[in-house]
């Protein structure tokens, strides 16, 4: 809370949270991407219908559940189920009341003989990872039953028998080729990102790739769904849009190109740094 410091958050909801908590230097600033950095990378042999690049988020949730009563476990499952229905919002913190945390920690302390407990923030993030992991698994399972899906990650999941696990790809050397070669690049945001535009979305666009993403409120401040980005509302809508865009190549290419132009125009590092310096000069 030092007044000399400025902290920039790409998620407006987080910036507002810290401002309300007395961090006067908290500011909102959307992320940036540099298409020039990716321009020299040649398109490789990464062709597929749908590509997903990222973690599968295998959380510590299942391990934690071993120390919980059936009641506590059921309550946390209810929180995960409720969060899974929310697109573009985060309700886990609101549902993790002080009474809930006391109940959970009572179970943990009993199971560990007084040696283990969790903070509200630790439990919230664990539930967020579990929720996102389940969403990503469900999406990949549903899509791999219908089309060719490549997963680029250090993580694997034996349940996804029809998906192709392609391992890690380097951010600068291989990632741009993946985004350009894949017909559809799928983004499923970590649900703790409440309003902001994830870097993955901007990177895909900066590479000239087509992105299908869950809805993020700040995305709508810059992009128009169906013109320079594709947005799904839920799993059913995601499947429908994947099938639609796989059948409409020219539209897919036009949206990808429009997204690329928008990133070039509105998400430059120079503009972000200029804004940061202007904020610093206010004092």
What function would you assign to each model-found segment?
Residues 58-148, 152:
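Extended, charge-rich helix/loop segments that form flexible
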Residues 1, 9, 32-37, 119-133:
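Nucleotide-sugar donor phosphate/pyrophosphate-binding loop at the beta->alpha transition
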Residues 2-6, 228:
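Short active-site oxyanion
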Residues 12, 16-29, 34, 130, ...:
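Catalytic binding pocket for nucleotide-activated donors in carbohydrate/polymer assembly enzymes
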Residues 2, 40-49, 164-167, 245-246:
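Short, surface-exposed amphipathic charged segments that create phosphate/polyanion-binding patches used
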Residues 39-42, 61-65, 162-163:
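Short aromatic-enriched loop/helix-cap "lid" or pocket-rim segments at secondary-structure transitions
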Residues 5-15, 23-37, 47, 52-58:
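Donor nucleotide-sugar binding/catalytic pocket of nucleotide-sugar-dependent glycosyltransferases
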Residues 1-2, 179:
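A short, aliphatic-rich alpha-helical micro-motif
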């Amino acid at each position: 809370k030092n007044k000399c410091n400025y902290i920039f958050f790409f998620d407006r909801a987080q910036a507002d949270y810290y401002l309300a908590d007395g961090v006067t230097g908290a500011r909102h600033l959307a992320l940036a991407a540099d298409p020039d950095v990716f321009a020299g990378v040649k398109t490789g042999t990464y062709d597929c219908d749908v590509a997903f690049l990222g973690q599968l988020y295998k959380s510590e949730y299942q391990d934690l559940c071993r120390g919980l009563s059936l009641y506590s476990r059921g309550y946390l499952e209810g929180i995960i189920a409720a969060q899974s229905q929310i697109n573009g919002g985060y309700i886990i913190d609101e549902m993790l009341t002080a009474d809930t945390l006391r109940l959970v920690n009572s179970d943990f302390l009993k199971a560990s003989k007084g040696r283990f407990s969790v903070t509200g923030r630790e439990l919230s993030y664990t539930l967020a990872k579990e929720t996102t992991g389940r969403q990503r698994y469900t999406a990949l399972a549903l899509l791999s039953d219908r089309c060719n899906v490549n997963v680029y990650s250090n993580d694997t999941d034996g349940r996804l028998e029809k998906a192709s696990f392609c391992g890690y790809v380097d951010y600068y050397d291989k990632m741009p080729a993946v985004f350009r070669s894949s017909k559809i690049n799928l983004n499923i945001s970590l649900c703790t990102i409440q309003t902001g535009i994830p870097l993955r979305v901007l990177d895909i666009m900066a590479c000239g790739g087509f992105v299908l993403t869950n809805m993020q409120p700040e995305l709508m401040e810059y992009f128009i769904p169906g013109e320079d980005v594709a947005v799904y509302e839920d799993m059913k809508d995601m499947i429908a849009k994947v099938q639609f865009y796989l059948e409409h190549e020219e539209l897919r290419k036009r949206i990808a190109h429009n997204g690329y132009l928008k990133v070039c125009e509105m998400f430059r590092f120079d503009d972000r740094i200029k804004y940061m310096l202007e904020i610093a000069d206010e004092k």
